[in-house]
Amino acid sequence: MYKRDTIAAIATCPNGGGVSILRLSGSKSIDVVKTVSLVSSNQCWHSHCILYGWIKDNEDQSFVDEVLILLMMAPRSYTAENVVEIHCHASIVLANEILRILVKQGVRLAKPGEFTMRAFLNGRIGLSQVESVLKVIHSKTIASAKLAANTLRRGGSERIRRLKHTLSLLLADLEFHIDFSDEFIDVDSIEDELRSTIQSSLLDIKDLISSYNKVSKLNEGTKVCIIGKPNVGKSSLLNAIAKRECSIVTNFPGTTRDIVSFETMLGNTLVRLYDTAGIRQSVDEIEKIGISKTELFVDECQIVFFVLDAIQGLSSEDSVIFNKLNLMNKNFVILINKIDKKVQRKIDEIYETLKCSNRRIIEVSAIKNIGLEKLNNCILDLSSKEDFDLPVHFSVNCKYLEILNNIYLILDELYTGSLNKSVTSYDFIAVELRRVLQGLNQITGDEVVENNVLDAIFSKFCVGK
């Protein structure tokens, strides 16, 4: 699976800049670079030194580019192998030419994520850290980047490793009890240890599982849903906030039949805006499906904007939606749109009708861009109220969540079921604890991972990482 040959790739984006970087990793990387470079004799090829020189083509002895060469000898490198970086001028033509010269010296082109895969296979980082590298690269907010970097720096899975250590000791004590139960083992003592350790483990796992929703908000952004009856200006509001036409706007009710989304940054907050199908009684089957999806989707959003039409005032259709939101126990904000139409009497009637609801009301005009600053501040305000302390050691992703849920079910069944029976089957508990440890090993990467699983993880990386 793991070829110990020397690999190379361009590590920087091809879209220009000041410098292009080529990266090599493997036992022959330093010798290869020595062969294709001209470096003055007073410079030493020592680890973690920077050399100045030229890359040359040995075929015609021509010079290709002026470069800096960074040396990182094993194991003090990203891959824990000998790593060399060549910094040349930011020309994709030059970078490709240097790469061609390296390949002619017997270096292989790296596959996507192969440098990080080598770091994992050489034991420098764990599997959770591998995924944190990917999260750092693809993070869209400062908070999510910090969380991923924190996971990467701390080894990613310290809490999981502590949990695994605790349960391993428990399993060892249990197996000792099983083997020597006829001699001198105190039955009450082992049962107390089982109950105490499993209970504390359940609390730890529950805390990790609960962090998933928090981390999801960081990675996916605050979900903001715009709802209301047809033609109140939901699509226009989305377009106004997005500052571009994301959603089709017409005078015909029911134009939006599916959920339209747009992602934007408000300050340091990632926001996902959703324009939804207008909620009303409809005979059109396709529109009815869109309305049904809207009603289900509202429950997933952290912020709901309920849009009213200042021209029409509060209608019976609006009242139906208002009551539905109250029944769902959603903390929604009321937007009175089209206030530029000089309909203050209707606006006053809306305030009078809703004065007992204690809902925040914002007056806006999507067409004239009135009230949008208040709207954006409202999003930031409500989003910040859902802020939380970042998990210190570990961020749970979707795959780990499934494993942790299964582990929780196993331990919960042991705690509430097996340990409360008149006759406790210690052999069964030992088997279940081994299943738990196997699951924890999958998270830390300590268990041998199938080739296709590794390939799936590292295929998400770019070449050069």
UniProtKB/Swiss-Prot annotation:
Keywords: Chloroplast, GTP-binding, Hydrolase, Magnesium, Metal-binding, Nucleotide-binding, Plastid, Potassium, tRNA processing. It comes from Cyanidium caldarium (Red alga). (6S)-5-formyl-5,6,7,8-tetrahydrofolate binds at R23, E85, R124, K465. This is Probable tRNA modification GTPase MnmE. Mg(2+) binds at S235, T256. The keyword Chloroplast applies. The lineage of its organism: Eukaryota, Rhodophyta, Bangiophyceae, Cyanidiales, Cyanidiaceae. HAMAP family: GTPase_MnmE. GO terms for biological process: tRNA methylation; tRNA wobble uridine modification. Belongs to the TRAFAC class TrmE-Era-EngA-EngB-Septin-like GTPase superfamily. TrmE GTPase family. Pfam families: MMR_HSR1 (PF01926), MnmE_helical (PF12631), TrmE_N (PF10396). The keyword GTP-binding applies.
